[in-house]
């Protein structure tokens, strides 16, 4: 998720916690736990407090991309690391390759705190192997001073009053996906006929598109170039920080989101400590510290009242879907309709 959204807040200078950058570290000592994830994923005090409470020292090792993580974990045959945090799609691959062990639910009793919206996902349908850490949710944000309609869902983006006024991110599967949600279809549709209908629907949106841009898309909203934007999580956070009067829309058709999940590798040197750490992270106060620090959406319902309200999905939102891999034929069709859509926007 960090690689997709470039939303990392760099980790502070390390105080009392070992750091290894992009390398495999093996914790031989049962009083050590090797944590493997992106840089900047935890406030230092959370790691320090875990050591104070348990006597277990956290050895923090980081990777730059999900693919790097999977390669390192494969080379280690599921060993070397105790807790890994990565994106949903790569966790799916790790589970299928036998590199992940089941969570000890007796130890991880705080799993009950996880918002049901984020449970039972495609990569772990029975919630046996992973625990959500945070979610990335691209959302519609608009300036109510510049927009004459009350935007409630994706379908409203097609309103004629929004001609040449919408800025969107450039992730083709996400944009195709929200178009499908507006049509009452799945974001992961593989039927070519339905994908073609999605393409036609997208072309109808083209007159309303002001720009397609992945980086700093929120700036178009903030400087008045666009009055509506569809933004990544970090961009939503930045937009609201700079202009609290902007409105955020949780689309009535349902959310499209991605999840960062915690898991214990199949041959983790210190699996007991790993499960203790995951349970500790799920304590409401600890979880709130982490979410407020990284700026992703809260997946721990017990922490909702402790988290910045802009990072909490309303209780009224009960539907969501994650973009998944599709067949090669479907993928080619998605690329085709995206190319045609961009041409129509020019």
For each feature predicted by the language model, list its residue ranges.
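Short, hydrophobic alpha-helical packing/hinge segments within bilobed ligand-binding/sensory domains
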Residues: 69-70, 91, 154, 217-220, ...
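Short, low-complexity disordered leader/linker segments with a strong preference
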Residues: 1-33, 345-346
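Extracellular/periplasmic bilobal clamshell ligand-binding domains
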Residues: 307-346
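Mature extracytoplasmic/periplasmic domains
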Residues: 256, 260, 265-323
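Early extracytoplasmic/lumenal segment of secretory-pathway proteins
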Residues: 28-93
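Periplasmic-binding protein-like
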Residues: 196-204, 242-266
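Extracytoplasmic ligand-binding site segments that recognize negatively charged/polar headgroups
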Residues: 80-81, 85-208, 213-222
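A ligand-binding cleft/hinge motif common to bilobed small-molecule-binding domains
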Residues: 91-93, 228-245
